[in-house]
Structures are given as structure tokens and as C-alpha cells.
UniProtKB/Swiss-Prot annotation:
<keyword id="KW-0472">Membrane</keyword>
<dbReference type="InterPro" id="IPR032675">
    <property type="entry name" value="LRR_dom_sf"/>
</dbReference>
<dbReference type="Pfam" id="PF00560">
    <property type="entry name" value="LRR_1"/>
</dbReference>
<feature type="transmembrane region" description="Helical">
    <location>
        <begin position="205"/>
        <end position="225"/>
    </location>
</feature>
<comment type="similarity">
    <text>Belongs to the LRRC3 family.</text>
</comment>
<keyword id="KW-0433">Leucine-rich repeat</keyword>
<keyword id="KW-0812">Transmembrane</keyword>
<dbReference type="Pfam" id="PF13855">
    <property type="entry name" value="LRR_8"/>
</dbReference>
<keyword id="KW-0732">Signal</keyword>
<dbReference type="GO" id="GO:0005886">
    <property type="term" value="C:plasma membrane"/>
</dbReference>
<keyword id="KW-1133">Transmembrane helix</keyword>
<dbReference type="InterPro" id="IPR001611">
    <property type="entry name" value="Leu-rich_rpt"/>
</dbReference>
<dbReference type="InterPro" id="IPR000372">
    <property type="entry name" value="LRRNT"/>
</dbReference>
<dbReference type="InterPro" id="IPR050541">
    <property type="entry name" value="LRR_TM_domain-containing"/>
</dbReference>
<feature type="repeat" description="LRR 4">
    <location>
        <begin position="136"/>
        <end position="157"/>
    </location>
</feature>
<dbReference type="InterPro" id="IPR003591">
    <property type="entry name" value="Leu-rich_rpt_typical-subtyp"/>
</dbReference>
<keyword id="KW-0677">Repeat</keyword>
Amino acid sequence: MGTVRPPRPSLLLVSTRESCLFLLFCLHLGAACPQPCRCPDHAGAVAVFCSLRGLQEVPEDIPANTVLLKLDANKISHLPDGAFQHLHRLRELDLSHNAIEAIGSATFAGLAGGLRLLDLSYNRIQRIPKDALGKLSAKIRLSHNPLHCECALQEALWELKLDPDSVDEIACHTSVQEEFVGKPLVQALDAGASLCSVPHRTTDVAMLVTMFGWFAMVIAYVVYYVRHNQEDARRHLEYLKSLPSAPASKDPIGPGP
């Protein structure tokens, strides 16, 4: 009667190891895409669609091989520094229709080379630091933001490659020059207007107040000096009048023969 041999330990070990590796691979695939998003993969290039997901912040687990990232129509209000720095293959980033209030100098660090389109339209951005977007070679959409038009914004815009299809929709919500409010900013700048030639009103007011104060002090000193001299002259004249008059001297020499 033949004996039944148990399975070889080596084969069992290999089978268990392969099962674990397969399980880990499946778990990795499941975690490669942010939970509320869709991440179709085409020939190793991932497109991440997170539109209309109610997101309040940028997901942290975006695949590194993402080429298209749609984060539009969410509730994102803050972009942390370096939020996209691991996405070296990213070509298009859509952040439109959010509640973004500000962008920092390091917000888009790591995207300088490959990014082709950055959509920041329909947000709440008021100011743009000069070094926040200047290193990007992408076309940038900034329309429908409550921009405060000042010299710093003008200098920042000159460094950007603005999307020509939406450039005329970039308007001033507030401005250091009231005539710019509500008007297409780039058109005004192209026509020769400048936001950098506006005098600082606060400085001017302080200077005028200082000058007026010095002028008032000079006038007061002159008035005091004149009145003081007039008073001295009056007292001196009264003193002279109070002196007794000397009698007329008689000629000691008599009349000639």
C-alpha cells in the first residue's frame, strides 16, 4: 500500500508568497487613485477626474504618473506649498470654480517644465505674487477672480503666458486707480496704462501734513519776531519822548561892533 506524501514545503511557500504579492498588488492598485475620483489609465498615463466631488483640499494620494488632473468645481480654498511637486508628468491642471483665495511662491513648485495648462479661473484670488507663477511655461487662465489691481499684479502678469481665449476676461475688482475697476486689465496695459506710476496717497498726505506744519511754524516765528520788534521799538520811542528836552544854548559871544 502506497503512502500519501504531503505537499512539499517549498511549493507551499512559493504559492503563499505569490498569493501575498498578488494581494499587495491589488491593494496598491486600489490605493493608486483618490477615493472620490476616477483614474483611467491609458498606456501608463493616468488621468485623474475629481470634478464635483465636494473636496475641500487637494488629495494627497494622486498617482505620480498623472498627466491630467481635474479638481474643478469643488470647495478647495487653500493650496499648500508643494502640493503637486511629485507630479512631474502633469500636463494639465484644472482648479477652476473653487474657493481658492491665495497662491504662494511654492504652491506649484516642481511643475515648471512639463505643465501646459493651468486653470485658476472662477476663484477668489485677489493678489498674485510675482514669483508664484513666473517660472511656469504653461498657459494660465485667471479670469473671473476678484483681483486687486496694483503694481505688483502688473509686474506678475508681464511674466505670465496668459491663455489668449480668456485674457480679456481678466478684470479689476478693486484697484489703486479707480478708472481700472470693472475693465479688462490686459487691454488697458497694452494701451499704455500703468499701475506702477500711481503715487502713494498715504505718503503724500503725510508729506503735506509735515510741510504744512513747518510752514505754520515759520509763519508763527515771523509774526512773533515782527510783533516783538514792534513792541521794542514802541517802548524805545516812548522812552525817548519821556526824556526832558534840553534848553536852547545862548551864544556867549556878543554882537560885533
